Curated annotation (Swiss-Prot):
SUPFAM superfamilies: eIF4e-like
Pfam family, one: IF4E
Annotated Low complexity bias: 39-49
Biological role stated in the UniProt entry: Component of the protein complex eIF4F, which is involved in the recognition of the mRNA cap, ATP-dependent unwinding of 5'-terminal secondary structure and recruitment of mRNA to the ribosome. Recognizes and binds the 7-methylguanosine-containing mRNA cap during an early step in the initiation of protein synthesis and facilitates ribosome binding by inducing the unwinding of the mRNAs secondary structures. Key component of recessive resistance to potyviruses.
SS bonds (residue pairs): C128-C166
Protein name: Eukaryotic translation initiation factor 4E-1
Record-linked InterPro entries: TIF_eIF4e-like, TIF_eIF_4E, TIF_eIF_4E_CS
Gene it is expressed from: eIF4E
Residues binding mRNA: 73-78, 105, 123-124, 173-178, 218-222
Length: 230
């Protein structure tokens, strides 16, 4: 949402000022197309016309990457997650999005997150601790557009219960990609059902989706059952 307008305004792909081909095979998962040390400066230098009239978002957001090459069976869960970049304007978002690999280009095992600034994409984060997540599944390599539209709806504050949303994550796995939206208060059924229904509408997603409490996921892992479904 652009702060200057009291009504919700949609951020769309047509507003992307500099679409680029990010098919650089030499780019490592989770890295910016520029040198990693120059990522922040590269992303904060959109065309001068956009610098003159930035469009602030209602919230600042941080991209996080979980590098599969850094994972090991001995490592604590979440220990390899690292922040990539924080953005607070529409222009900064597009500068970053245009210079990172999209899900179809990430290696198997990679997790890419976009969470509200100062919320870590971990169950242990105090804001996430009592929450849960909605999850959609996609054929391997076919989640790019849905990931983008999820981000646009989320950072553009298109959800009626946007304050309930912590962030979103795309998980790249052998047989499928998964996109999840994490929320704060899993027991608030009205909020969770609203978020799930709107998300399906935004993406025109016709398959059933389920909501799992983080607490259940911690206890039962893959055998955790959906508490809500749409």
């Amino acid at each position: 949402m652009v702060v200057e307008d009291s009504q919700k305004s949609t951020i769309t792909d047509e507003q992307n000022p500099s679409r680029v081909d990010n098919d650089d095979d030499d780019l490592e998962d989770g890295e910016i197309l520029e040198d990693a040390d120059d990522a922040a400066s590269a992303a904060s230098k959109p065309p001068s016309a956009f610098l003159r009239n930035p469009h602030p978002l209602e919230n600042s957001w941080t991209f996080w990457f979980d590098n599969p090459s850094a994972k090991s069976k001995q490592a604590a869960w979440g220990s390899s997650i690292r922040p990539i970049y924080t953005f607070s304007t529409v222009e900064e978002f597009w500068s970053i999005y245009n210079n990172i690999h999209h899900p179809s280009k990430l290696g198997v095992g990679a997790d890419f997150h976009c969470f509200k600034h100062k919320i870590e994409p971990k169950w242990e984060d105090p804001i996430c601790a009592n929450g849960g997540k909605w999850t959609m599944t996609f054929q391997r390599g076919k989640s790019d557009t849905s990931w983008l539209y999820t981000l646009l709806a989320m950072i553009g504050e298109q959800f009626d219960y946007g304050d309930e949303i912590c962030g979103a994550v795309v998980n790249v796995r052998n047989r499928q990609d998964k996109i999840s939206i994490w929320t704060k208060n899993a027991s608030n059924e009205a909020a969770q059902m609203s978020i799930g229904k709107q998300w399906k509408e935004f993406l025109d997603y016709n398959e059933p989706i389920g909501f799992i409490f983080h607490e259940d996921a911690k206890k039962h892992e893959r055998s955790a059952k959906n508490k809500y479904a749409i």
